[in-house]
Amino acid sequence: MADAAATAGAAGSGTRSGSKQSTNPADNYHLARRRTLQVVVSSLLTEAGFESAEKASVETLTEMLQSYISEIGRSAKSYCEHTARTQPTLSDIVVTLVEMGFNVDTLPAYAKRSQRMVITAPPVTNQPVTPKALTAGQNRPHPPHIPSHFPEFPDPHTYIKTPTYREPVSDYQVLREKAASQRRDVERALTRFMAKTGETQSLFKDDVSTFPLIAARPFTIPYLTALLPSELEMQQMEETDSSEQDEQTDTENLPLHISPDDSGAEKENTSVLQQNPSLSGSRNGEESIIDNPYLRPVKKPKIRRKKSLS
């Protein structure tokens, strides 16, 4: 029967194309074409009176039919291109059949035969359309230079991008290691810069550039550091100055109790200074001239006394 032959042909094509069906559209097209040829071969065998056929026989006849049709198409295309045309016509196919030794006059009688079997078209199964869960905007149409059979552009939501940022590292150990490596890199870069720009010394006499060392520069005036005040002395001087200012503010805030004897002594001092203005000028001059801290008179630290509530 034709159904048995078609089943055998379909099974043979399955073994030929592979046990698993491919999801590639090109592979699906070749598989569908192969099955169509097997159905045609099965119908021809049924018309010839065969009830069943072996798998190898169906495959051989399918290959012969496919080769015959391919040769007709190739020859028709070559005749078409020979006459400076791009698409073959019926005359090209007729010339091809004549060149292949086929009698074209027998085609109408063969098409009108009484035992001809009508092959129905295979059912077209449309793939289920999955609803789009997310739609943002409208799809872009194809530009004029892109053919319409090409796939459509992706949905607009696929072009949406969200920039990502790396979270800052908050681990204490990692931060310490990173700070130590940065400090080490800075020190190495600084020493290399000093070695390239300044004078260097080498541990090896033969090769000077192998292990350069920064040359030690002696001070031009070595005793200058002994004459300059240190940080401790400057801090002590600032503390004494601040204590004097505090005492001065305390004396300004306290009520003045001046005895008559003290007032008389102050009047005498002011009268002496008025008679000899050179004394006050010399004192002010000495204080302004003496700028070296080692030549200044020694100042004992004053003890701050707490105010008594009376």
Curated annotation (Swiss-Prot):
What species is given as this protein's source? Answer: Bos taurus (Bovine)
Basic residues composition-biased segments: 297-310
Q: Where is the composition biased (Low complexity)?
A: 1-19
What InterPro entries is this protein classified in?
A: BTP, Histone-fold, TAF8, TFIID_su8_C
Q: What cystine linkages occur within this chain?
A: none
Gene name tied to this protein: TAF8
Q: Where is the composition biased (Polar residues)?
A: 270-283
- Return the Pfam families for the record: Bromo_TP (PF07524), TAF8_C (PF10406)
Tell me one GO molecular function of this protein. protein heterodimerization activity
GO cellular component annotations of the record: cytoplasm; transcription factor TFIID complex
Q: What is this protein called?
A: Transcription initiation factor TFIID subunit 8
